[in-house]
Regions:
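C-terminal catalytic histidine-bearing segment of alpha/beta-hydrolase fold enzymes
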Residues: 134-173
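Conserved loop-alpha-helix segment in the C-terminal half of the alpha/beta-hydrolase fold
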Residues: 124-135
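Short beta-strand/loop motif that positions the catalytic acidic residue
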Residues: 111-114
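A conserved short beta-strand
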Residues: 86-96
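Serine-hydrolase catalytic machinery in alpha/beta-hydrolase-like enzymes
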Residues: 1-61
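Alpha/beta-hydrolase fold nucleophile elbow
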Residues: 60-71
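Acidic catalytic loop of the alpha/beta-hydrolase fold
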Residues: 116-121, 129
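Gly/Ala-rich beta-loop-alpha elbow adjacent to hydrolase catalytic centers
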Residues: 70-74, 78
């Protein structure tokens, strides 16, 4: 997250990165399952999206444009916020739980990045259910985490291509 915040800042975007975990230190990569369980049991998608919507209300008048960029759980949270009229766009990387909220129709430009495969669902099936909506979807070589340079699933080529598409999307909208 810090890398993406830094990169976007270097491209002259103001970046706000809220701490949705309500704890000082992040989970270690080896604690991925524990981190996800903590999120689902103690925070949840609805509560997290309400926290982000509240933040959006606080900042919307301070900026010409407001976007949400989310990874994994954050991508699903961005998706849940996509019906807010104060958003100018969302970017979602491997938001696997979007599959639980396919009834949402984003009101803002939306770009989603998925890996070729996920452990818990069929990526092509989710993409197929989302293609009817007016959103941009890209599938990249690799697995969940392909854009995270600290992940064992990191794929440099896919990460760079997704990053370029994200920046182009943000500049376009």
């Amino acid at each position: 997250m810090k890398n993406i915040c830094q990169l976007l800042s270097e491209k002259d975007f103001d970046v706000i990165c809220p701490n949705l975990l309500n704890q000082e230190t992040p989970f270690e990569y080896s604690q991925e399952e524990l981190a996800y369980r903590n999120f689902t049991e103690n925070i949840g998608f609805v509560n997290a999206s309400e926290e982000i919507k509240s933040l959006l209300l606080d900042i919307k008048d301070k900026y010409k444009k407001v976007y949400i960029v989310g990874f994994s759980v954050g991508a699903t949270i961005a998706w849940l916020c996509s019906e807010e009229d104060c958003l100018d766009g969302i970017v979602g990387y491997y938001g696997s739980r979007i599959r639980n909220f396919v009834g949402i129709d984003p009101l803002c430009p939306t770009i989603l990045f998925f890996p070729e495969r996920e452990q818990t669902f069929t990526v092509d099936q989710l993409i197929s259910s989302l293609e009817k909506k007016n959103i941009e979807i890209h599938k990249f070589y690799g697995q969940h985490g392909f854009s995270d340079p600290y992940s064992s699933k990191y794929d440099e080529k896919s990460a760079q291509e997704a990053l370029n598409r994200m920046v182009d999307f943000l500049l376009k909208h």
